[in-house]
Amino acid sequence: MASPASIVKLPNRGMASDPEPAQVSYLPWLPYWAVMEADFLQVLRSWVYRSWVLVVALTAIGLFTYRWGLHHEAKIIQPASHVIIHLMRGMLVGSVALVGVIAAGAIAAERGSLADSILSRGISRHQYYLGKWHGRLLAIMLGHALLGAIAITGARFVLHEDVTVEGGAAAVAMSGAMLAVVVSLGVMMSALFARPLAAAAALWVLLYAAGVVFGALPHSVPTPEWVLQKLPYVLKGEFTREMLTQVAMYAGGACVASAVVGMFLFSRKDI
């Protein structure tokens, strides 16, 4: 048996060295983006969302067709701003119920698989909540902008033109701000309740209670009724930048406050 001293190591003839481990970059907001994208597409495919967009679009087309026939048969001049304000009132009142249902099912509808399938895969509760909130908010705002564009375009071409493009865009933005608050409150309720029906019921109770409180506030506060009263003038272009800023600040503050409360309670809730 050869001694250890007599063992000669042969030179390395072309043997490849061990490859260096690849640098893996971790994007901390990638789970949030995945949840937001999946939820956004899920809302677009839901029958409640499609029914909402279809019903409102058909209502607008039917109303414009009737008004157009009335104008050509009876020669009655109908300002577009009056027709649009009636349409937008109906859109907002009718949309609150369906939008509330869509928002209330953001988290409550996935309680059965929430802990095992989602929160155990490297995503925090805050990221999950933000992804759900922004996904629902983006889908609702997209649908509202589409319906608003249909209403403004139809009114300008079919009825007596007294609506400006800037006024129409501002009116859609102001009404969209109110829907954004409803969506934010709905997602907050969805994080607190285990069932979508309970979350939707709690949301409607909260909205009715808020309506009572809004009635006692000063007229300078941009409540939903205040916004609806200003819309006819906004459609004609009679608005100021301060008015839009005021609505955006109040609506944005309500959205952020509801999101903070929802994330705080959701992070401490046993699921």
Describe each region flagged by the PLM.
Residues A2-L54:
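Aromatic- and glycine-rich beta-strand/loop motifs that create alpha-glucan
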Residues Q23, Y49, V56-A106, Y129-L203, ...:
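Secretory targeting signals
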Residues P31-A34, P218-G237:
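Short hydrophobic, aromatic-rich alpha-helical segments embedded in or entering the lipid bilayer
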Residues Q42, A109, R121, I152-R156, ...:
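Transmembrane helix-loop junction
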Residues I118-R125:
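Short helix-to-coil transition segments within interhelical loops
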Residues H126-L130, F266:
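Alpha-helix N-cap/helix-start motif at helix boundaries, enriched for small hydrophobics
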